[in-house]
């Protein structure tokens, strides 16, 4: 378990685009779950107090699985679509953690 990586990312939808971003995030989560056996958890969340704020909680079996995720063509397509449709504003905040046990 010590090789497990946990990724926490915060994403802010552009004003009025929360529902569209939520739909895209749910779609992306389904693709990742099916395409990436090294991804243990890939779960988007929406804030209960701010409908335009989202958090991703992700876990990968090891650094190689996370690297495969970052290089996956479906991730590139997701980012391209997010940009093209103007779904987000600001910078995506990402923190990566290594399991202690």
Task: Walk through the language-model features, giving the residues of each.
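Glycine-rich beta-strand-turn "strand-cap" elements at beta-sheet edges
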Residues: 1-5, 43-52, 78-101
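N-terminal first-folded block
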Residues: 3-35
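Short, well-ordered beta-strand segments in beta-rich or mixed alpha/beta enzyme
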Residues: 4-12, 41-71, 95
């Amino acid at each position: 378990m010590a090789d497990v990586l946990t990724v926490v990312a915060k994403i802010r939808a552009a004003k009025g685009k929360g529902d569209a971003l939520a739909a895209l995030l749910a779609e992306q989560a389904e693709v990742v779950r099916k395409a990436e056996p090294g991804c243990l958890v890939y779960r988007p969340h929406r804030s209960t107090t701010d409908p335009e704020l989202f958090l991703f909680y992700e876990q990968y079996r090891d650094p190689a699985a996370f690297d495969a995720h970052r290089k996956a063509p479906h991730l590139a397509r997701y980012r391209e679509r997010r940009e093209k449709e103007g779904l987000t504003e600001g910078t995506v905040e990402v923190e990566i953690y290594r399991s202690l046990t």
